[in-house]
Structure formats: C-alpha cells, structure tokens
Amino acid sequence: MANSQTTRVPEPDEALEVTQNGVGSEDRPDPPVPAPGPRRKLILHIDLNNTILVSDAVTCLGTLAALDGFLSTVTWGKMNQKGKWEWLSDAASLIPPCEGAISYYSQFGRLPGFTSGPGRRFRGILDEHLDLLRWPEGITADKELSVKGEDGRLYHWILPSFFQLLRDLVSREDDFCLLFRTFGSDLPRVLSAVSRTLTQGAHPLFPDLPDLKLSVNQTPGKIRCSKREVVLTRGEDKVSSLNGPRDLYQYLGAGSGLGGFQDTFDWWSKHSCSLMGGKPLWVDPFDPTVQHIFFDDNIRQNDKETIVHPMVFLERGGEAVRTASTCELYDVCLVQNDLLKAISDSGYFSRRIAICQENYEKNVQQGGDLLGHGRCTTENH
C-alpha cells in the first residue's frame, strides 16, 4: 500500500546503540500502545526459538549458547584488504550499521563460544541479558517454566515479555488468536507450559493469568509444503491449498485462544533457506476484519535468506495470490524479532504489534492497498 510518510534511514556511518532496552534502541520512546477500541482481529504468528525461547531444541543449544549464537547474527564487520575480519561497530543491531557490513554469522557461520573468542567485545551484552533472564531468586525451579543453563543457574524458559503480551492483549480488549509457528520440536512442551500458566497460575511473575480466561489448544498442528500443495493438519482437522489457499486463510483467521503448528524445515532447507521455502503466511488486503502479524528472529530484509513466505490475495474473495517481498510487509505484517529487546523490555511485543497496526491503518487509509513500500531499515526497533 502506498505510504506517503517518510521514515528516516540511518546514515551509513551511524551505529544503532545498544541500551538497556536491547538491540538498536534509541533515545526516543517507542510509540504508545493504542487506546482500547474496535480494531481488526489479530492473528499473531509467533516463532519459538530466539523469539520467545532462548534455547534451540533442534541444535541442542542451551540458554547461554543460544544467546551467544544470536549475538553473532547482529554484530557487524567486513573482511579488509588483507583478508582479515574487521569490526565496523561495537553495537549490536538488527540491520547493518553501514553499507558493506555483514554479520559475523553470515561470514563465518555458527561459532561456539562467540563472545569468548572473536566476539569478546560483546561479552558484556551477553552477561547483561543473561542476568535479565534469571529465574526469580528464592523461587523453586519449575520443570516447564525454568531451565538450568550451562553455568548451572536457573533461567526463564519462556520470556516474561510473552506473558506480558497476553495481559496487554486482554486489557486492550483485542480480539486475537495466537499461533506458535516453529520448525522445532518444542511445540508440545510450550503448549503444555502456557496452558498450565493460564489455568493454574503457575508462573511466579504472573500468578493472575487465569483471570484472562484464555484457552489453549494443546494439540500440535502441522503445516507441510510441497510443489503440489500446502496441507495443514491438527487433530481431525485437515485443510489443503489444492483448490486454492482461501480455505487455509479462513481456517487460520477463524481461530481463537492459543495454539500452534510445526512448519516444514526440510522445505525451507531445500529452497536454500530463502523466502520461497519459508513458513507460509496468507494476507488479504481486501479483508477489513483481520490483520496477520508474524514474529520471527529469522525474518530478513534479504529475501534470499528469510524465513516467512508471504502470499497476498489479488482480488476480493479470490484464490489467486502473489508472493510479496519481505520489505513490502516489514513492520506491517512481518516483524524481525529483536531478542535482546524482547528480553529486556516487557512491553516489546505489544509495542511492535501497535506499530504494525498503525502502519496497516495508515496504508489502508492512504490508498486502500495493503502493502507498504520501503519499510525496511526503519528505526522503530
């Protein structure tokens, strides 16, 4: 959708400073959460690892290793003329601080002990955020909600900011459905832990969550992609795109409460971890009742290395879709998760949603078209 407002892009030599609020934080505060009022139903698709969990069951990474590895993806440098790595910023940021910068991870791949070796200058960021992740002192470990780190200390398994998001959504009187979307094997455990927290008040920081009256569908679903079709299954439900994707869009939009689906890692890997093999997301710019928002740390502005495949309907009620680039939906329906800020700022998820809602409404009002243009490299992070 057309967007006449201009967002200032950082100059090439500007580094986004790391503050206590996380990656790329600025002096100015985030936009406020909108006042309660009638809005589109929110369908929130939320990744698990490095989005609301600081661990990775697929790669068997614990809390320290997962956070250490994440830092290698948000710290930037380049190879100099002598063929040696040269750091371009002492700050961590989701976007490159200048033209030509590449992340350490993109250049060298995963390196165990990144902040104890070449990334030692970022060790302070690691330690600061590990402290923020600590399980409350004096509170007994919980088999589902806490996890013992490699250093023997207890940490939150699910970020507290996720539970704060649930509080905020209910207090704002939003109509919403929250769907976990993961390639990994943690989904059953997450659904169980969240259900117990919402029904039994098991979380020491959020004992009042049962008052929210939210339901959790603990049956893990699956979304399987092939050249022929996309098939969604959950329990006895089965929906296919064989006759068009509209049925899948309507199924996801009709949900309530919380649930989750395991997506197809092999399909993404087969497509070289690019947009075309990513987790499918259908968006209908003609639907006045629903807005889909997808949080994932692996959403990238480069479609050759991003994790969500957005498909936009071309006409009202139709079946035809086109693939949208990440930049078209960035901060409208796609949010590149800032793990450091999600750890340090309890209102992070709610503010990101508010930004997406604001951008969506502006774009609809300015042209009736959904898609934004050039929203990439914004400073809202």
Please state what every model-predicted region is:
Residues 36, 172, 184-381:
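C-terminal cap/substrate-recognition subdomain and adjoining C-terminal extension
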Residues 2-201, 205-211, 323-381:
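Alpha-helical substrate-recognition element adjacent to the catalytic core
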